[in-house]
Design a protein with these regions (language model features):
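Gly/Gly-Pro-rich "capping" loops immediately C-terminal to redox-active cysteine motifs
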Residues: 29-33, 47-86, 104-107
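Positively charged n-region of N-terminal signal peptides that target proteins for export
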Residues: 1-4
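Bacterial N-terminal signal peptides
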Residues: 7-15
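C-terminal capping alpha-helices of c-type cytochrome domains
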Residues: 85-134
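Long, low-complexity intrinsically disordered segments that are proline/alanine-rich
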Residues: 23-26, 131-135
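Protein kinase-like catalytic domain
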Residues: 43-46, 127
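Electrostatic cytochrome c docking/interface patches
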Residues: 17-36, 47
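Short, cysteine/histidine-rich loop/knuckle motifs that typically chelate Zn2+
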Residues: 38-41
């Protein structure tokens, strides 16, 4: 009987923890704009964005890796076969060189899950032309 109650309590706490983890992973675009300032040394976003050290990030969410026009991507990035969906971006932003060994991106990654979710929410606001669109 005690083991049944213990198992039930464990299941309830695990479910509650999972629900909380899902809630905390939803991103806030406004907070993401602040996190994105760390990316601006290499990347631009918006209607007047231009490639620099890194490619323009307009419309990046949903785009195939290594495909923004007029940017010289590493072979590793071009040949990765990745699509920048939310799960892939989450993994990449946590440790870029781990997901794509040989990438030109020198940034080590974001350590906080909420920062990653927030910056993805920020990126999702911009279409391929750099216009803000409704999420």
């Amino acid at each position: 009987m005690k083991s049944t109650l213990l198992g039930l309590a464990t299941a309830i706490l695990t479910a509650a923890g999972s629900a909380h983890a899902q809630d905390s992973s939803s991103g806030n675009a406004e907070a993401g704009a602040a996190v994105f300032k760390r990316c601006m040394a290499c990347h631009q976003i918006g209607p007047d964005a231009k490639n620099g050290v890194g490619p323009v990030l307009n419309g990046v969410v949903g785009r195939a890796a290594g495909m923004y026009p007029d940017y010289s991507y590493s072979a590793a990035n071009k040949d990765s076969g990745l699509t920048w969906d939310e799960p892939t971006l989450t993994t990449y932003l946590r440790a870029p060189r781990k997901l794509v060994p040989g990438t030109k991106m020198t940034f080590a990654g974001l350590s906080k899950d909420q920062d990653i979710a927030d910056v993805i929410a920020y990126l999702k606001q911009f279409n391929a032309q750099g216009q803000k669109v409704s999420p």
